[in-house]
Amino acid sequence: MSVSTPMLVTFFIYILGMVLIGFIAYRSTKNFDDYILGGRSLGSVVTALSAGASDMSGWLLMGLPGAIFLSGISESWIAIGLTIGAWLNWKIVAGRLRVQTEHHDNALTLPDFFSSRFEDKSKLLRVISAVVILIFFTIYCASGVVAGARLFESTFGMDYQTALWAGAAATILYTLVGGFLAVSWTDTVQATLMIFALILTPIIVIVAVGGLDDSLAVIRAKSVENLDMLKGLNLVAVLSLLGWGLGYFGQPHILARFMAADSHHSIRTARRIGMTWMILCLGGAVAVGFFGIAYFENHPGQAAGVSQNGERIFIELARILFNPWVAGILLSAILAAVMSTLSCQLLVCSSALTEDLYKGFLRKNASQKELVWVGRLMVLLIALIAIALAANPENRVLGLVSYAWAGFGAAFGPVVLFGVCWKRMTRNGALAGMIVGAMTVLLWKQYGYVELYEIIPGFIFASIAIVVFSLTGKAPSAEAQQRFAAAEAEYLGK
């Protein structure tokens, strides 16, 4: 793709805007609570859009449209599973987690919450969960750096190493400086950009082909299987794709948004906004890939880019169908998707290192100012490690994203779900669930005889372990049960 001045200008303005937001947030960051959770001050709109944007990475504008373009509508099962999982997470977990974390020593991180909720004097829960976060999220961050590098490489013709730093630098800067507020405010802008791109692009593609009926006719003529929801899939394959939705209950970067809401009363409105945004974005991504089939079938001379790599479908359609200024805005949406996810993952890693390890074990009486600066240093450290991992694009980092999603979903998902819904759950139950969930994912990935996504058996076995170990051990203390009951009563409005 040739580099055009409008695209360069658009990208530069967008990146400058994100960094500016970071410096504005810097002025509002007074203590570590502000840096990690924004002082629990997020309203409904910011909570909803930042949760959505931090969830949907470059996969939304590249991976999903590419899969639909290559294989047809059957690849949309994963979008259905994610939508169901996200709604259940908002409905069951979001409000309860917001209240429970405040009642349990104003917990700022998931390991912090687990330690307080289950009265873990040994700090085993805090250490194990912090280590799980660091391992999986460093891999996750590396995948985001690779995706950003690929965008700069293909859009501006940069060599990979230069693109690596260009794609990561702005995200690191505004996360480093502004912390959670910067990440959440930029997520809101980025979510708006993403939904604009994903609604506008498929409409223009359909118009370019000649309308909806003509588009469907061309797709059907190429292969009627493109419209078959079960093309090449059996029951296990469908369940595996739907199973992605289970991952939501255990994703620390999404759960952090719930914890940061200004009140659990904001969650209901945030859920409606967030789910509307998500459905429109996923629907738009599916439509880009689906109707892209019709466009390139009618214009085979323009299909060289997508023939080489189906994941370029959105990039190619933006470049071909829009003037360079609008194309620059649309392509900035891919960068927005990458940056929004990478920034919150960097922050969650930083909080695990600072709150759960540095303050928890090394400097219990550290000042707020010290913790903020240690948090910033940790953002930089994790970012540099992620860039080092991403330096060799052949190391298949992107292929590990589904592994990390399953790892978090199985290790943390059942612990969070039972932890906010069942007062009888104990520390041993939480430990057993976390270990069994993580080990099941690892072993199933290596030795699973059934081609079932490892998050499903991981989630099931972890849930069984939680119930068995909680019921066979000593019940939680009266104080712990009282705190849980008080939080639940507040959530229910009693």
Language-model region placement:
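Membrane-embedded helix-loop-helix hairpins and adjacent transmembrane boundary segments
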Residues: M1-K494
